[in-house]
UniProtKB/Swiss-Prot annotation:
Gene: lysS
Keywords on record: Aminoacyl-tRNA synthetase, ATP-binding, Cytoplasm, Ligase, Magnesium, Metal-binding, Nucleotide-binding, Protein biosynthesis
Broadest EC class assigned to this enzyme: ligase
Keyword ATP-binding attached: yes
Principal place of residence: cytoplasm
Transmembrane segments: none
Identification of the protein by name: Lysine--tRNA ligase
Amino acid sequence: MSEEHVHLDESEVYHIRKQKLAELRTSGFNFPNTFRREHLADALLKQYSETEKQTLEQKHVKVSVAGRIVLRRIMGKASFFHIQDVSGRIQVYLRSNDLPDVYEQFKHWDLGDIVGVQGELFKTNTGELTINAEYVELLTKSLRPLPDKFHGLADQELKYRKRYVDLIANEDSRKTFLIRSHLIKAFREFMDDNHFLEVETPMMHPIPGGALARPFVTHHNTLDMTMYLRIAPELYLKRLVVGGFERVYEINRNFRNEGISTRHNPEFTMLEFYQAYADYNDLMNFTEQLFHYLCDKVLATRQIEYQGQVIDFNKPFERLSVKEAILKYHPDIKAQQLETLEGCRTLLNDLGLPYKETDGLGKLQIILFEETVEHQLFQPTFITEYPTEISPLARRSDTNPEVTDRFEFFIAGREIANGFSELNDAEDQAERFRKQVEEKDAGDLEAMHFDSDYIEALEYGLPPTAGEGIGIDRLVMLFTNSQSIRDVILFPHLRQ
């Protein structure tokens, strides 16, 4: 029975295919692993698509390909079918006269089965590059049907839960994750070319630190101690700068026990790097160069369409302080209103934005910025002069100790990167840790712990340093025009 021409539910198809597999086993089929592929579909198409039909016949090009059957047309004593590999699809022509035994078996194979094919390239009368099959072998029997006659998964959540099916059925999904891979490779190339050393730091920390976030908690049985999945590698990377590795970077996972949204996943990938004898201005310049490189290398353009609008990486990236950004996007607000607790509270009350009575001036300014301005920063924009109150690891500004030499980098209304001149004064850092502990004791679950070992490392001397973290998942969203972070993470977290 051919399921392609009869409407069957998935359980019926599964049962029929199980029977087919049982019959195959009795004839000696054992999921063979001796076929060796020598060519990819896309490479063959690129090399021979423009070759004239007669010229191709004269060349007698022999190929060996393998992939999944995704389309087939059985026409009496001859059939066409398409196989799909990681690079794309190519057509195969199989004749009963050439391979009578295989052809009889082929009629009972199904969409989704994986085959190996050897043969000679030719072009059909319509000009399609095709393999004239001289050898065909079933390599894997597929027991479950491809979705929706191979037009893709309609259920968005099912795409996330069964990514393996999504990747089979959805070319756009495959392209998304290929771009992700190319992007990470380009990050590494740029960092290596700029003399940064790639390192690996612990994923389980005895003390959570490096960011304001709620950690995942676990327990080390042998050591009998509480451990935390890392929320950021920052403090370990800066220890390495203390140790003499003056330019370091790491691409790895961070874990934050927080909400899930179109922009947040509890497990996410970041590039984090540190450079001695540099400040946050140097890093902003470096970031512009980095993004130019990424655009050129991965997309071959510096203008990217995202959700119907164009992001222009060619223009100099705008730089605004937190206060300047608020005033730019709120022309009705006076600068003096941002300078007092009373003024900021009034603004937040008028806008219906909640805050705590214990929030300081800097925190109130940030609430106003994040809730009303951030989403409007569509073109690449650096926001600088973050309040010291919310920047416990950043160096204070020499001109205004209430703010830090820190920036956040925004594109399409979301934070893509965070960087600053590092605080290398051990006594100042210890005092800020103490304030964080006070906030934690007062109920702030995201406040930092006091890391005495990190303070000791600073006491050995951290050179003037700047560091930055870049969210790779969010950047992949931009480069692939994806609306949700779940579209760019292979296996995102979902409710059971």
